[in-house]
Swiss-Prot record:
EC number from the UniProt entry: 3.1.3.57, 3.1.3.7
Taxonomic classification: Eukaryota, Amoebozoa, Evosea, Archamoebae, Mastigamoebida
Molecular functions per Gene Ontology: 3'(2'),5'-bisphosphate nucleotidase activity; inositol-1,4-bisphosphate 1-phosphatase activity; magnesium ion binding
Protein name per the record: Inositol polyphosphate 1-phosphatase
Subunit structure, as described in the record: Monomer.
Protein role: Catalyzes the hydrolysis of the 1-position phosphate from inositol 1,4-bisphosphate. Is also able to convert 3'(2')-phosphoadenosine 5'-phosphate (PAP) to AMP but with less efficiency.
Gene3D superfamilies referenced in this protein's UniProt entry, alphabetically: 3.40.190.80, Fructose-1,6-Bisphosphatase, subunit A, domain 1 (3.30.540.10)
Amino acid sequence: MQTSLFEFANVLITAVKEASYSISKFKEEVEIKYKSDGSEVTQVDTQSQQIIFSIIKNKYPTINIIGEEDVENGIPDNQLPTITQLSFGSLENKIININDIIIYVDPLDGTDCYTHKQYDSVCVLVGVTYKGKPMIGIVSKPFYNNEITFAIENYISSISLQPLNDKIIFVCSKKNDIQHLIKSFPDPYEVKYKGGSGAKMMAIIHQEADIYYHPLIQSCTWDTLAAQVILEAQGGIVCDIYGNPLCYPSSKKESMRHKKGVLCLSPRAKKYLPYMLSISKTILL
């Protein structure tokens, strides 16, 4: 099966938009459960994933979608939305093969932030690889007017950028503070704390931060791919902490975790890649 790039992108954007809207409008009491790895999951996560899967699978029944949660379709066809029709500037509307596509879905990134009402760290993340390479990234912030940011190859949607800080800004969670690792950083810096992998990477995309260093076997494919496509289209770097490309397996039968951690650098922070890699020489993952 084949489709045009523009049609495919519009289906994905519609799916993210609808899922994001469902999160922002959820009014029932949130029920928290715990997965085998100890992470939280709620009915809001599963509802969001059902919406995304239903919209995409209705159009492309055989497509390979890997979602964080263990649910798939669930929305009746007669309740599916009309697909949005955006144009993408001078981007070539090429024909793509569905069999060469893998979609990675995090229906609610930052679930623990969501349950603690830290809504600025909540995102919906949908990323796509084509023939094994990152191709499309779509990120929505449900509690910021369902703001959607996306990149298709090197085409980037409109992004609000913050004024650059005089210091280099590191972003991490308080739980996984990295201050002890970067004491010898060569220039003035500051550490800001934020939850959610997607929110940390989006902070770099919006110029609120410069470096995200995560030297743990914790982040998964669906946590990183969407924002990776956007950040790389801006000219930034996304890799593991040793400088290798992040891996995106084709099946949940393989580990979805990034076993060598995650490192993200803004365009202006790329010059610090050698320094960050030197830190990683002391860390065994």
